[in-house]
Amino acid sequence: MVPPEEIASASNPDIEGENILHFLCREGDITDLMAFKNVISDANRHLVLQFNRHGKQCVHIVSNPGIADPQEKLKLLMEWGADINGQERVFGNTPLHIAAYTQNHKLATWLCNQPGINMGISNYLFKTPYYVACERHDIKIMNILRAKGGQCRIYRCNEAWLFTRNY
């Protein structure tokens, strides 16, 4: 069980604007995050949705490369009320955008299989996850999104190969 003093200080962000869940999502493994499972309640559920100083919620932190157990962490965060379609404050990227930007095929596949996932959200640069995959010439993520019914229309793109290649 997590000590009460840790929960009491969990709402107090550190100098980076991060609460304890932000830290555990970035630095810990799934067992560290699971230690909070019995402690998360309606009184402190807001911690899951808090933005850090960089405009990221827990779902954005675990979607970045190099994070241990991203799918398991996302599953737990969603149980606690995290928004799988939540947009970060700086660029408006969702976890699916981040998976496309970082070419994380495993995470993109997992996200596309989640109920309620919105594959057609545009970030603040008016790019859908599919468009991001096109920019990166990532046929695999494009196919993952297309197979799950993602928005596949490209309205503007400087890459001529997108219009001449058969998929």
UniProtKB/Swiss-Prot annotation:
Work out whether the entry's keyword set contains Protein biosynthesis.
no
Picking any one GO biological process from the record gives: cellular response to tumor necrosis factor
Instruction: Give start and end residues of every ANK repeat.
Output: 54-86, 91-121, 125-154
Q: Which UniProt keywords apply?
A: ANK repeat, Host-virus interaction, Inhibition of host NF-kappa-B by virus, Repeat
Known InterPro entries for this protein? Ankyrin_rpt (IPR002110), Ankyrin_rpt-contain_sf (IPR036770), NF-kappa-B_inhibitor (IPR051070)
Q: Can the keyword Repeat be found in this entry's annotation? A: yes
The GO terms describing molecular function are: NF-kappaB binding
Q: Which family does it belong to?
A: Belongs to the polydnaviridae I-Kappa-B-like protein family.
Q: What does this protein do?
A: Suppresses the host immune response through NF-kappa-B inactivation. Possesses ankyrin repeat domains required for NF-kappa-B binding but lacks the regulatory regions required for dissociation from NF-kappa-B and degradation. Therefore, prevents host NF-kappa-B release and subsequent activation.
- Which named protein is this? I-Kappa-B like protein I1
